Every structure is written in C-alpha cells, then in structure tokens.
Amino acid sequence: MLERTLRVLEYNKVKEQLLEHTASSLGRDKVKHLVPSTDFEEIVEMQDTTDEAAKVIRLKGSAPLGGITDIRSNVKRAKIGSMLSPNELLDIANTMYGSRNMKRFIEDMVDNGVELPILETHVAQIVSLYDLEKKITNCIGDGGEVVDSASDKLRGIRTQIRTAESRIREKLENMTRSSNAQKMLSDSIVTIRNERYVIPVKQEYRGVYGGIVHDQSASGQTLFIEPQVIVELNNALQEARVKEKQEIERILLMLTEEVAVEADIVLSNVEVVANLDFIFAKAFYAKRIKATKPIVNNERYMDLRQARHPLIDPEVIVPNNIMLGKDFTTIVITGPNTGGKTVTLKTVGICVLMAQSGLHIPVMDESEICVFKNIFADIGDEQSIEQSLSTFSSHMVNIVDILEKADFESLVLFDELGAGTDPQEGAALAISILDEVCNRGARVVATTHYPELKAYGYNREQVINASVEFDVNTLSPTYKLLIGVPGRSNAFEISKRLGLSDRVIDQARNHISTDTNKIENMIAKLEESQKNAERDWNEAEALRKQSEKLHRELQRQIIEFNEERDERLLKAQKEGEEKVEAAKKEAEGIIQELRQLRKAQLANVKDHELIEAKSRLEGAAPELVKKQKVNVKNTAPKQQLRAGDEVKVLTFGQKGQLLEKVSDTEWSVQIGILKMKVKESNMEYINTPKQTEKKAVATVKGRDYHVSLELDLRGERFENAMARVEKYLDDAQLASYPRVSIIHGKGTGALRQGVQDYLKKHRGVKTFRYGDMGEGGLGVTVVELK
C-alpha cells in the first residue's frame, strides 16, 4: 500500500486512536507496525478474531490484560548469562501471571458455552510456568526487594544485621543521653555516614569520644564521629551486609538461570499476549466508534450501509449508503464545493483500509467490503514549492503515477479531478482519465464540480452520477449522498433566498441554454424522486424488521411453551408412577397382614377374597398411570390427508392447514402466521366443513390445562406476584384472549401500583383500566391485549 495513500486518507490518525486502547507496550508496538493486508484469507480471519474479542467485551466488559509488560530484552539478557535485577524478575513473574490469567479467562468462557474458536486457539499456545512464577514471587516482594524468606541463609544474615544495628543504636543512644552529652554534642541524635553509625560532636570535643571522623558540617563546627567503642560493632555490621549482598546476588543468579532455561517458552507466551492486547485494542476501538464487522467478499464489490468517517464525531456526521462494483464500477460525485464530497471520498478509502487491517468499520450490520491489492488516492492540495509545481501540476504528477499502476484489483479515489486549469480542458482531461482507469477494471470514486461530467454518468454503462444534497432553505449542505442524481449549482435558488430580485434571476436564466435549464429541472425532479423512494424504503425496512422481531418472539414463546409442557408431563408421569408404586406396596402389606390374621385365626378371610382384593388394587394402578400420562404422539391418522385439509397439531393443541407433503411422514403446516414441519403422527384430521375462520379461545397447555380469564394475586408477595403476572400475560396472549382481569385487592396499593407499572412496559398490553363497579372496582385491573 502506498505511503502517500495512507497519509492522505489519515490512516495514521486512526492508528493513533487505536493506540489509546492498548494495555501494554507490547500491544502498542503491534499497532505501530499495523498496515493493511491484501490477502483475502488473512483479512477474513482478522475480522473474525476482532469479532470474537468484541463478543468478549459485550459479555464481560473487559479482558484481564493488566500487569503485562515487554520483558523480551530482559529474557534475552538472561539467556546470555546477565544477572537480572529484582524488578526485572518481578516483571517477568507478573507477565507470566498475566498470560496465565488470560488463558484461564478465555477457557472459562469457552467452558460456559461461549464460542471463541480463534481466541481459544491463541490462548492454547500459552504454556503455564506457575512453578517459576511462584519461585520469583516467593523471593521478591511487591516493592522489588529480596525478602528474608528467599533463603534460610539470608534470613540468618538479616537477623545478625538487625541485632548488630540494635546494639550499636543502644550504645550510641546511651552516649547521647549522658549528663555531658548536651554540652559536647551538637544534637542528641544517632545518624549514618558512609554506611556507619555516627553521632554529631562539637569540634572542640572531638578527642573525648575517640574513634573515626567520617564527615563534618558545612561550617566545620560539627564532626560526625564513629566512637571507638562501636568501631568493632560497625565492622561486624559491615561484614554482615557484605554477606547479605553476596547471598542476594546468589539468589538473583539462581532465578535468572531458571528464567534462561524457560526463555523460549516465556518469549512465546509474550508474543501471544502481545497479539491478544492488539486484538482487544481493535475490539475496544470498534466499541468506541460504534463499528461493526463487515462481510468480506472476493468479488470486487462493496456495499457500505450508513457509513461514517471514524475520525468525525458520530453524533455530528451524516451516515451514507455507498455501493460500488455490482451495477456500476465508477461513481462521479458532482456539485459545488463545501458540500461534503471529499468527506464521502475519504470515508470510502478509510473504511477499506480499516477493513483490510482487521478493524471493524463504522457501518451498519450486513455491510460488505472487498479486498484491493492497491488503493490510490489523489486528494487535497499537495503542491511542492521546492519543485515549483502548481496545484494542477502537482495533481497531474500523482495521476500519471496512478495511471501507470492501476489495474482491476485497484481502488482509485480522485478529488476534484481536472481542477486547477481551464474548465473546458480540465473537464476533457477528467473524462479521458476516468475512461482510462475504468477500462482497466479499477473501482473508482471521483468528485468534480465540472457540469460537463454530469452527462458522463449517462453515457457510460458502468458509471453512475451522484451528488451531495443541498438544502436551499437553510443555504447549507445536508451531506446526504444521492446516488443516481447528479449535482447542481443551486445558484439561482441561493440568490433568491438571499434577496436577489426575480427580474435579475429571470434575466440570468435567459442567458443559459434551454437544454441546460431542462437538465437542471430534471435533476431537481430526480432529487425529489430519490427522497421519496428512500423514505418508502426506510418505512418498508422498518416494517420488515418489526415482522422479523415478532416472528423470533413467537418462535421463542413456542419453544418455551414446549419445554414447559414436556417438563410438566415428565413431572406428572413421575408422580403418577410413584403413587402407583406406593399403592402396590400398600396392597402387598395389607394382603400380608390379612394372611397373618387368618393364620392366627383372628379373622375369617378366604384366599379367593385375598386374590380378588389384590386384583382390584392392581387394576387401579394402570388407571392411575393412564390419568397421569398424556400421549403426545398418537398413531398416524387413518384419514387420507391432502393439501388444504384442516388438522389439529397435538403438541400445540392448535388448528392448522396442510400446505404440502415434504416427506413420507411429514407435512408443511400453516399455524396462524407460522409455517412449520409436522409429522403425521403428531396431528389429527378435523372433519369439519370449510367456513369463514373465526378466532377462538385456545387452550395452550394441552387438553387438561386452560388459561383462566382472571389472575388472583391477593396474599402474594410482591416478587412472586410480578413473576405470575409475566407468565400469565404470555399464556393469555398465546390463548388469543382479547381481555383479562388481574385481581390485586385494594390494601396499601403497593401491589396495584407494581402491576400497573409492569403493564405500562409490557409489549403485549394495549390498554388497561380499573374494574367497573360490577368488576371489582379499584381491587381489579382489566387488561386489553393486542
């Protein structure tokens, strides 16, 4: 990709924003080296990877990338035998922990059913080095100091140091508290000079304490003396400190050697977490600019829906639909300057660059983008003073370079093509240049203010005109792109709005040819038609989305209904079988007891009476099972079924009409607005004459369950009551009830208020009111359902 193209399309500014979302210098380094790819498979994988990270952010809010630093140079130094400092080792341990934590985070999400195949592959490359991590953290504290517990020897040495320091301080403090101390000392303190304990002695008393002078004050009046009585103690302390330093170095070398052994694994883990930091930075950036994953195709067309420029505030910019490559390969945007043509041009270019870099782009869902091997852009005034080039010459140098390199795998962006010279010659050059790049199969977007190019889009099959809408009422551009409508100057309308007289404007119109006037009028009508068509499309699209949403909701309710029904059937069957088993055991017990009584001659009971009693008890058991079980699947209907027959679908308890037979055992059935496949064993033929369909109250829970027309909540706790209201309204809607009543009582009014607050937000509620005098008054709410 040409560096000039990246510069004029402000690709580096996008990277600067992306840098703000990295968690470490590792991720920042990846962003700095980011360039668009031209490999189709790589781009698709990068987009899928960013999408998985975006899914993690949607579900979890963030990713645990804290504590990770760039430890690569430290690890490489360890490999060649250089001793690492405590802080360097601590950075390695923290990064090992961060990589292990990230691996566990992704694996936990996968274990919980979240599909993250690409991220799972990434974290699978992370090798846990828990033992090495713990060795380092057991030896080095959070502040970067080697702790006493790093070795028994170090603990012993530090005990000696603390003991020696305590003895020295005790002796010196006794000296400072003596009766003569106030006279001989400048201050009653114990301090340190040259790593040895000293006291501040006045110059004239230096011989009283003996020992060694280590320092003096700026005035020379105070000497910092190590008294003779503690010289040996200070010497012992220094020896212990030397031993401490040697032991610390031994521990650091030992840890460094262990890092060196695992260096290749550590470096591999670092590369993985660097990529993860980079991936999640792209996902966070997508969230920031409200971007989505585009569909990447290899067929050289793009369909950007509601595209926005990522560097412009999304609350300010006007999104546009931009299509290129299917019905036309070139878009020529005409119209006056300051209308937003250049922004549109840059939006196309930066969206392509971002997509080919694995970044999501600021467009609506289902947008498509293709892969270009080269992107050329001639945008802005980049004339060179040193080369003494004019604006026109500067553009032409760039255009010559583009014409030498552009091919069918190129996207070419021209801003104000042919500008900077005589309008007639400039327009002619613009047409020839466009013809040249179009003939090479390149995809082209060009802006121009030359009116001669308006006809260009009508005379070439693969070229279409476009313009940026201008509001003559506000005298400002709306920045709305109108594809298929060439731009017009609007000079007469603007002049009239600003107060120029009709007489002057009419005279001006007379100076323009009739054909030009006709073209301007035609363009105005095209603009109006475009607006109307777009408005109609938006309304139709809104209805389509609403219908899809309703369809999904109905499917969800049916699935929930089936699951709940099956659960109840299983529960009822289990309870029935338990009751049967209990009855059998009780019967056996009774019979056994009767036999024992007879043997004891305490009762006159015959065998045939015992057998008869047992048979009655056993006969009751199948009946109980029969009552508990509900046969969902009946035998196939005996009636020969044909398309158009009315049947009852047993699993739903709903009527439907047969559409067509899809297999030997299955039919396509229309049930209300739903169409589904149903097995013949799951339906009953209804032998009724065809008549005008009437809406009936449906039994939605099977043959033994009916939805009541009222729900009584009196005595319920608030949370339980709300849950019952939610389920009851869903059941009532499935049963097609037009109206139901909810009894909440009068009481304190809290339950009544809670019910009515919930009804206000329920999507299936049309209206609601208090009950009339005969309906329960303020203790009842009557609900009208949609």
Swiss-Prot record:
Superkingdom in the source lineage: Bacteria
GO MF annotations in UniProt: ATP binding; ATP hydrolysis activity; ATP-dependent DNA damage sensor activity; endonuclease activity; mismatched DNA binding; ribosomal large subunit binding; rRNA binding
EC code: 3.1.-.-, 3.6.4.-
Annotated binding of ATP, by residue: 335-342
Record InterPro entries: DNA_mismatch_repair_MutS_C (IPR000432), DNA_mismatch_repair_MutS_core (IPR007696), DNA_mismatch_repair_MutS_sf (IPR036187), MSSS (IPR046893), MutS (IPR045076), MutS2 (IPR005747), P-loop_NTPase (IPR027417), Smr_dom (IPR002625)
One Pfam family here: Smr
Keyword line: ATP-binding, DNA-binding, Endonuclease, Hydrolase, Nuclease, Nucleotide-binding, RNA-binding, rRNA-binding
Keyword Protease among UniProt keywords: no
Subunit description: Homodimer. Binds to stalled ribosomes, contacting rRNA.
Protein name: Endonuclease MutS2
Provenance organism: Bacillus cereus (strain ZK / E33L)
